[in-house]
């Protein structure tokens, strides 16, 4: 991804008035000369072209491409990676100038690539709190094969009509040279949109250079090679580009070189450039206008107050629409001069004279340090990140610069609403006006507590929202302050304390609302058997795209606390499971079994915690429904409302759920039930019952393929009760609950197709005689990779252990180690002995987090979608802003080797990765899902992205044991837990909604 700030099509801009671009020297000389083009003087186009070539040859040696990542969301910047440009402004000390939105407000990791393709690490030493510039530093001694040259900053040379070149990493193409002419030097700054970085209180320079992403931070040079401006942004649908003047960057550079503080002053007011005609409408006195025009003959505008921030130094003094006339008794119409005065007046009084309508108003404001209201630290806790509200964001929404901003709403604080833009008001009914108060409040909250949080959206201060969150200090253990260190360029971590232990759950009793028997008939009492389920997953595994899932579960055994839900709600066993009874009581639960082929997840809760709540166990009927059977449908729609209808079974078929591009669990080899009622498409969970209230089928949500927009397609289907009963009986009896399974996936085919493929007529007659209703057989569509291929794709199953197979339930092998099968292969009937396989290790039981990527063994959905496994190290996800993101290690890839050493499994991978030093490159051999080999180089970053090894362990807290590897050979228990990966988490909650 290449980053370049872009203005919206409707961004504010001021007309330049009557100014027109001056003719360039070439045109002027050609006009004056009476000679032919061949006889041009050396000062003509030929000399100009030569001069440009010489200047550009020198400039390109100072320009670098920057490849960087912001590893954490902070202020206006999301976490992510990008490419941009920079240029050397001090070769001796190693300073580079680029944009603030490149240097990033938050943690930055990056390197620069010079013209000769030498690479050097860079780190930020300064990012301006307001303007779009910052400085990176590098070690000049690390550049061995070229002389590093610096460019001179000449803000005085930026004039209308100046021919310029933009030299940089345009479109991430390493080096591009774009030509243009400066057309304006007094335009207002572009507006890049909400909740993103926007410059203010300066003028911008405009030219039509048609730059694109990646050119941010490029030098804008004139023909002698002097830098006259800094490329900052551009229009999305035009060739227009916007440049930052260099007056303030030049001052900051001098301060860095002299090792003096870069003071920045503010009165917390935004000014805009307004033309004289606009100022006249606001009340500008004609005598004052004449005075200004006389002093500044080329002036076309003055400064007008646009925004005054509440509780700031100028609050209740300046007002919107005030025209600035004097500052400290000096007429001032230039934003750069205003900034210069404020920067030199931090802590001092500044006297302003403004025209307000027909009145002249003189007022005094004390200039405040802008650095004091630009956050340089954040707190990470419960998987989310918090910092004091910044001047940048407060200015955009005219808010006082106070409050706690949630820069990364994740983990426990993944709140309902938009993805970003939350201001936290209170926790546990205690106000949190600033970050220090927030820390003290969080210290007193035990792990797993459910606490009230008050918050509002930054764009809507009138609507205060109260919600309840569950504090997670067991998966996401980190509670630390992260502070910017401009000496090292890193952000330093400081532990803020261990979590208080969770308080034990206490029994509670509630009543269950009764349904009207007249309206709901035989299903009225089934409401007593349902509980709601909330599953929170701190890591994305097995191709899952969500952090939270909501659904319902049917209680099967109230004495043992056993219930069943779908694997669309509980896809894997790493997370926190909570059930809600009668919308009143919430208690913890745990996953006890995930069925390897059916869409069933069995969960367990402590019945004692429900006290005398009249929860009931559903009665399941050991009966397979048939087409045409009358049933009662009882379900929960997308709003969790109960609906019911009397209907009938329309079909019972062997369903094949389409697979998604990123493999994830899907039910295979099962018979699905559909019903006539339209309610079935609106409900993601429920049951089908007979007229006696016995459950004959569960109603479940299945995830299938994805649409072209990337949204999940959901299928709502019924599953017969006998399938559930077989697992329930195992759980109740205490025997091994994991069934044996076949290593293949089937699909149903008609006998006519089998006949065409060579099945003898006598066998078809026998099948028709035995099957009765179903004239079908089953064809192998996938064989699980990594298992013996006794059966192959395209085989047709004729019989198993002497019985014709026309229904999928005839192939149940729960307790069978081997099956004698008669198959049709390549037109010939054959007999084979097919082994079954235990499903004990079907689920993910080890996870390695490295480079910000989540690695695991290929889960069963992967093995059923691929022919052969390149390795047993599978990338299931990656975090934004991580080394994996920056160096293009993508999801659904396999890691086959590390530094040339084959890594067949996670054990091999961890062994090799522990040998590698921090900040060094590692050569990673990978294979795509389609077996295309790719070799990557990834830089280790153990400061922000340590390697963490998670192994399922029943004796450990949460059922998982975690080990963190920092230095080579060093092993310790992780104090930070791990960071939730939100890259593909495209919704706060995933509910069992309408079928798509």
Swiss-Prot record:
Alphabetical list of Pfam families matching this protein: PDZ_1, Trypsin_2
Recorded GO MF terms: serine-type endopeptidase activity
Cellular component GO terms, alphabetical: nucleus
Biased composition (Acidic residues): 980-996
Domain PDZ: 280-358, 745-827, 860-930
Region annotation Disordered: where it falls in the sequence: 1-35, 972-996
Gene Ontology BP annotations: lipid metabolic process; proteolysis
Keywords: Repeat
Family classification: Belongs to the peptidase S1C family.
Protein name (record): PDZ domain-containing protein C23G3.12c
